């Protein structure tokens, strides 16, 4: 696996692979890799001949009181994991390489509608930072396909919409959320949890499962269901940021015609913000 830190070397390496007739797969990350990231890399390897990963802790997607400075940076360990997963090229740029004219002067890519509300409501500007950095990375790598995890469901929807609206020639693939044995969605931020908090954290997933069971059992009183879910989270010691049920296709409010739903939640446990979601197919309901 080659490691490059500047755009010129990245483009040269990708051009060589493309010149050999190889299909390019891409997995953008912020590092501190876990099994969820590795599943994305392996999926890219199944669908492409040459896998590029990036590690870049993107300051544009962090708010002023968020964990940019404390976000784990584990490049050496990440390189080993990527190599073992079959990655061919790692792009690990500096902030200066990505934003040479300064962050304040960076052109911003904003995806209206789907980026608003949910995490976008709680983290103003977050998805502007995500869509901006991903569009830059797509322009640098020029991949045939890119793989994103379903754990960040709203992010996946934002990227799909951006690619559609800007006519980007890249196929977006998704990979199901990878979970610990007790159901907790794997996340780089899980390392912030204390032992007691880690023991409590799976209640988020259990609550989403209870709501999914209710929906598949025929309940359609969404406001009451959401209130029950919020109460369950609070009773377990979590501080809900949001809990909502949306149309899974476009994240719009549920209508009578909706058959594919997604339950989305974010909640604080101590100082750690956890997010999760579950898809619900009403066509398979009891």
Swiss-Prot record:
One of its GO terms (biological process) is pantothenate biosynthetic process. It holds the Pfam family Pantoate_ligase. The reaction proceeds by a bi uni uni bi ping pong mechanism. The active site is at 37 (proton donor). Its main location: cytoplasm. This is Pantothenate synthetase. It catalyses: (R)-pantoate + beta-alanine + ATP = (R)-pantothenate + AMP + diphosphate + H(+). (R)-pantoate binds at residues 61, 155. InterPro entries: Pantoate_ligase (IPR003721), Pantoate_ligase_C (IPR042176), Rossmann-like_a/b/a_fold (IPR014729). The keyword RNA-binding does not apply. Homodimer. Beta-alanine binds at residue 61. One of its GO terms (molecular function) is pantoate-beta-alanine ligase activity. Belongs to the pantothenate synthetase family. Pathway: Cofactor biosynthesis; (R)-pantothenate biosynthesis; (R)-pantothenate from (R)-pantoate and beta-alanine: step 1/1. PANTHER family: CYTIDYLATE KINASE/PANTOATE-BETA-ALANINE LIGASE, PANTOATE--BETA-ALANINE LIGASE. ATP binds at residues 30-37, 149-152, 178, 186-189. Its EC number is 6.3.2.1. It is an enzyme of class 6 (ligase). The keyword Nucleus does not apply. One of its GO terms (cellular component) is cytosol. Catalyzes the condensation of pantoate with beta-alanine in an ATP-dependent reaction via a pantoyl-adenylate intermediate. It is found in: Cytoplasm. SUPFAM superfamilies: Nucleotidylyl transferase (SSF52374). Keywords: ATP-binding, Cytoplasm, Ligase, Nucleotide-binding, Pantothenate biosynthesis.
